């Protein structure tokens, strides 16, 4: 069980390609993102968590398009969001989503290194959309996205906090 959607997606989808047919290692078939595991395997109907804050959910590119943690806006599919399903079990929480909810934050692994100015601008735009929801926190299952946006917000003194979704699900335990 991996705590980051982009890491889980890499191992699940790209590790077999790197192994070039050598399948002694079955990691790609066994790895799951923590949200995927909790939602699809554990299937909790209640949690003891208490988090009396307004949160805006960040749907990461890898989480949406590779792990199917939520439905992508560009497809005509029924809407679902495993992250929000789990957060709804938390007492006291107010859940929001930004405009253009599944648009990239600009991190994208090597993209942020190869195109740092574009990456920063995309992150700034995404943070502004999250802040426009009135949220106190931005949350999601992808540590790299959260770290990218948190770094930008800190440099620009933005009054928003960042927290991994699992920290909320475990709040008050």
Give the positions of each predicted feature.
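Iron-sulfur cluster-binding electron-transfer modules in prokaryotic oxidoreductases
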Residues: 1-173
